[in-house]
Amino acid sequence: MATIKDVARLAGVSTTTVSHVINKTRFVAETTQEKVMKAVDELNYAPSAVARSLKCNSTRTIGMLVTQSTNLFFSEVIDGVESYCYRQGYTLILCNTGGIYEKQRDYIRMLAEKRVDGILVMCSDLTEELKEMLDRHSDIPKVVMDWGPESSQADKIIDNSEEGGYIATKYLIDNGHTDIACLSGHFEKAACQERIAGYRRAMAEANLAVNEDWVLEGNFECDTAVLAADNITAMEKRPTAVFCFNDTMALGLMSRLQQNGLKVPDDISVIGYDNIELAEYFSPPLTTIHQPKRRVGKNAFEILLERIKDKEHEKRVFEMQPEIVVRNTVKKLN
């Protein structure tokens, strides 16, 4: 494996000059730069990240802890984070925990051992023990994204789920719907509790009673949406609209309802949450609550960089504002 001395020898310059060319730390004449880079290419030289990290006290590596990277919402946020990491010369280590306690614990330990410069956390079900573990690594800058836990050591970006739930339900009410169901994720999750609270607030403002049999529990995946669609189809009195707490469930619900002979939106209206890319191209295109996923990723990374530069900065909370994207799955009844 080639060393910096080999590059310097081939280029006919000092190792210091090679270092300045590679790290862009000082002006070097263009002809000299060309000689150095030609030698780098010929020798297939790669600087030692370990040596650089020891010298600079930085690995230029970010760890990202996520509940489920295959979830379409998460994958779009991850795409935003990765894009901005790449532009800034950082490597992203993605840790997909699957919501498993042991994996969350072990990944946090592993990221600490790898001396990452910072950690992004996007987990909906961190326990108190895990929150304490994050706090124990107080020397590592952290930003918590989406509906993760509060931490005394981390900046936080919140998605304002209560307001999003309110906006979705109010839109249905404004279009004449009074019999409105909601398909939640697991009831114990903070985001679901907030979206249900927003749903109830909009119903209460309109003096509409909530049918508790229509507050359905899912898991943010298609399988429970299919079960919910079968349940709704079999109801003697059906809701005229369903507010789904993410687009994945909304699309699964729509597909099954239409298999069961119910047309969306002619027979039943559906509104989703997240505005994943697929929502626009489904048939019919899904009306949904937009969350700026790539902007969340960008903001999280930028905030983390600020935290890396100023570790003593007091904890901050940044709030994202949800907004409705109107397409073709809500029927106007008034």
Curated annotation (Swiss-Prot):
Gene Ontology MF terms in the entry: DNA-binding transcription factor activity; transcription cis-regulatory region binding
HTH lacI-type domain residues: 2-56
Amino acids binding hypoxanthine: F73, K189, F220, D274
Gene3D superfamilies, per the entry: 3.40.50.2300, lambda repressor-like DNA-binding domains
Flavoprotein is among the record's keywords: no
Pathway: Purine metabolism; purine nucleotide biosynthesis [regulation]
PROSITE patterns associated with the record: HTH_LACI_1 (PS00356), HTH_LACI_2 (PS50932)
DNA-binding region boundaries: 4-23, 48-56
GO BP terms, alphabetized: negative regulation of DNA-templated transcription; purine nucleotide biosynthetic process
SUPFAM superfamilies, sorted: lambda repressor-like DNA-binding domains, Periplasmic binding protein-like I
Keyword Cytoplasm: no
Keywords: DNA-binding, Purine biosynthesis, Repressor, Transcription, Transcription regulation
UniProt cross-references to InterPro entries, sorted A to Z: HTH_LacI, LacI/GalR-like_sensor, Lambda_DNA-bd_dom_sf, Peripla_BP_I, Tscrpt_reg_HTH_PurR
Subunit field text: Homodimer.
Annotated domain remarks: Consists of two structural and functional domains: an N-terminal DNA-binding domain, approximately the first 60 residues, and a larger C-terminal domain, approximately 280 residues, which imparts the function of corepressor binding and oligomerization.
Purpose: Is the main repressor of the genes involved in the de novo synthesis of purine nucleotides, regulating purB, purC, purEK, purF, purHD, purL, purMN and guaBA expression. PurR is allosterically activated to bind its cognate DNA by binding the purine corepressors, hypoxanthine or guanine, thereby effecting transcription repression.
Protein name: HTH-type transcriptional repressor PurR
Originating species: Vibrio campbellii (strain ATCC BAA-1116)
